[in-house]
Regions:
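Select subsegments of transmembrane alpha-helices in polytopic membrane proteins
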Residues: 50-63, 155-164
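Alpha-helical transmembrane segments of integral membrane proteins, especially early/N-terminal helices
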Residues: 15-21, 48-60, 121-129
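Hydrophobic alpha-helical transmembrane segments
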Residues: 2-8, 61, 69, 167
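Membrane-proximal soluble regions of multi-pass membrane proteins
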Residues: 20-34, 107-155
Length: 167
């Protein structure tokens, strides 16, 4: 019972932090990781994409928190611990799905309108993954959210991701 209470509290806090972090859509001149012309943010198409992104982000975060409440009632067993751990990390990963969708949609919109891609957009895959062989830094500031992300083109970046995935 105590384990479920602790896991539920951690899940709600972590999903809440993810929500607050991912809610910041405009960072370093890039809207959801895509650099657009200054007047493009006011276009109805762009506003629609942003509103859909925020709506899906809220829905997924609320569903993950509600799903955690349902897991609270599982009987005590080792299976419950496994389910909690998988659900916890799965919930954190699910919150990034709207980011991937919105980034790809904005990139297609940029290409449709013929707006040039900024040089800073090239090494970013989906606005989340950084791959720049010419950049020797192991980690760089994120374009979506807070913190840093690994440069997947460097050995140190790959090792950092591998260690985090194993841990």
């Amino acid at each position: 019972m105590a384990f479920s209470i602790i896991m539920l509290a951690c899940l709600i806090v972590c999903v809440g932090i993810d929500y607050l972090s991912l809610k910041r859509i405009d960072q370093n001149g890039a809207l959801l990781g895509v650099t657009l012309p200054p007047d493009a943010a006011a276009l109805p198409e762009v506003q629609s994409i942003v509103q859909q992104y925020l709506r899906w982000l809220r829905i997924i975060c609320l569903l993950c928190a509600a799903g955690g409440v349902g897991l609270f009632f599982l009987p005590d067993s080792l299976l419950r611990v496994m389910v909690w751990v998988y659900f916890f990390f799965g919930s954190l990963a699910l919150t990034y799905l709207p980011c991937l969708w919105a980034n790809r949609t904005l990139q297609r919109l940029r290409d449709t309108h013929g707006w040039p891609a900024a040089p800073g957009d090239v090494p970013w895959k989906y606005g989340l993954f950084y791959y720049a062989p010419d950049d020797t830094r192991a980690s760089v500031p994120k374009r979506i959210g807070k913190g840093t992300t690994a440069n997947l083109a460097t050995l140190r970046g790959k090792l950092a991701v591998a260690v985090n995935a194993i841990a």
